[in-house]
UniProtKB/Swiss-Prot annotation:
GO terms for biological process: D-allose catabolic process; galactose catabolic process; lactose catabolic process via tagatose-6-phosphate; pentose-phosphate shunt, non-oxidative branch. Transmembrane segments: none annotated. The gene is lacB. This gene was sequenced from pMG820, a laboratory-derived deletion of the naturally occurring plasmid pLP712. Pfam families: LacAB_rpiB. Heteromultimeric protein consisting of LacA and LacB. It catalyses: aldehydo-D-galactose 6-phosphate = keto-D-tagatose 6-phosphate. InterPro entries: LacB (IPR004784), RpiB_LacA_LacB (IPR003500), RpiB_LacA_LacB_sf (IPR036569). Induction: By lactose. The operon consists of lacABCDFEGX. Pathway: Carbohydrate metabolism; D-galactose 6-phosphate degradation; D-tagatose 6-phosphate from D-galactose 6-phosphate: step 1/1. Its EC number is 5.3.1.26. Belongs to the LacAB/RpiB family. This is Galactose-6-phosphate isomerase subunit LacB. Keywords: Isomerase, Lactose metabolism, Plasmid.
């Protein structure tokens, strides 16, 4: 099984630890960055993870930022992604078994590493349990999606990053 993983600069070390854990369990890890602690933007990495999952390049995805809120919101904008921000086993299992979630999001500064590993492993091993009710619910979720061709462009963030590099944005 191939697992896509991505993070922002705040939790690079957490992502690397999760990546090593997944590899130790025999999973193929597709690491979409970031790879260091240089200030960057979580939507870039959420988008990359989501696109890898939806395209079939990866079977499932894991997104991590400081609280998990930002990157999870970003990955959920990719049409076809159903991601859940979780901090506990019950939420992760519900997301996979009832909503057929294909990405899981974490706050790397919120959820401890060992718990995160346990939750990820349970999420991967859980199976979607289709019922007429949850099939209808998933169809309603998918109906909300709208595709924006502009965002599908690989250069979507280029202008933003060029402005950042020129110092036009500040924290």
């Amino acid at each position: 099984m191939r697992i896509a993983i991505g993070c922002d600069h705040i939790v690079t070390d957490v992502k690397m630890a999760v990546s090593e854990f997944l590899k130790s369990k025999g999973y193929e890890v597709l690491d979409f960055g970031t790879y260091d602690h240089v200030r960057t933007h979580y939507p870039i990495y959420g988008k990359k993870v989501g696109e890898a999952v939806v395209s079939g390049q990866a079977d499932l995805g894991v997104c991590i930022c400081g609280t998990g809120v930002g990157i999870n919101n970003a990955v959920n904008k990719v049409p076809g992604v159903r991601s859940a921000l979780v901090r506990d086993m019950t939420s992760a299992l519900y997301a996979k078994e009832e909503l057929n979630a294909n990405v899981i999001g974490f706050g790397g500064m919120i959820t401890g590493g060992l718990l995160m590993n346990d939750i990820i492993e349970a999420f991967i091993e859980a199976e979607y349990k289709p019922t007429e009710e949850n099939k209808k619910l998933i169809a309603k979720i998918e109906h909300v999606e709208t595709h924006n061709a502009h965002q599908a462009d690989e250069e979507f963030f280029t202008e933003f990053l060029e402005k950042w590099d020129r110092g036009e944005y500040h924290d």
